[in-house]
A protein has these predicted regions:
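HhH-family (HhH-GPD) DNA N-glycosylase catalytic core used in base-excision repair
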Residues: 1-182
Length: 182
């Protein structure tokens, strides 16, 4: 589980992500282990309201995630599913409408697509957002496709070292860096 790796054999992101996981409290590990299951329950509710698939429900939840806290994200997904007006970024609403027909394919951004897949149960999906960039000391909060893939690979590598799914490792690092599960 805690294999000793020579520091020259890992990337900076792997090193920093590994340090986050090693500093995790039991409460943080518990939060991370259930976070996506709880998010999936929201997506299942949205899907049920709309009479559609989990893929579509998760994609709608993810569509409202950019620049939103989780509670607001959930409220907007429920409002959308219930046909109520949704305020906020117009692009998020466009993605949610497209998700009704296209599911995951409506989400062109790496982050929103991976988030929908993780919510829908893909344990290998890794979401790289501002907090994951900061945890890796990335030079930007908005990674290029290449940097996104590098950070995602680093999470997967560290997850494997600790016997975690990549999705759970990402949630754990996020909770530690962000300071809460919200």
């Amino acid at each position: 589980m805690n294999t000793i790796i020579h520091p020259m054999e890992i990337t900076t992101a792997e090193y920093l992500y590994n340090n986050c996981i090693l500093q995790a409290t039991l409460a943080q590990v518990e939060q991370a282990s259930v976070w996506y299951f709880e998010a999936q329950e929201v997506a299942e509710d949205v899907a049920e309201i709309l009479g559609t698939s989990l893929e579509v429900g998760a994609s709608i939840v993810s569509a409202f995630s950019p620049r939103e806290r989780w509670a607001s994200n959930v409220a907007k997904a429920y409002a959308f599913a219930n046909g109520k007006p949704v305020a906020g970024l117009s692009n998020n609403l466009k993605m949610a409408n497209a998700a009704l027909e296209q599911g995951f394919d409506a989400l062109k951004g790496q982050k929103t697509n991976a988030f929908a897949r993780a919510i829908a149960g893909d344990t290998n999906a890794v979401v790289i957002d501002v907090w994951m960039c900061r945890a890796a000391n990335a030079p930007t909060d908005s990674p290029s496709k290449g940097l996104y893939n590098t950070l995602s690979d680093a999470v997967t590598s560290v997850a494997n070292e600790h016997g975690l799914s990549p999705r759970t490792a990402q949630a754990l690092i996020w909770i530690i860096k962000r300071g809460s599960a919200e």
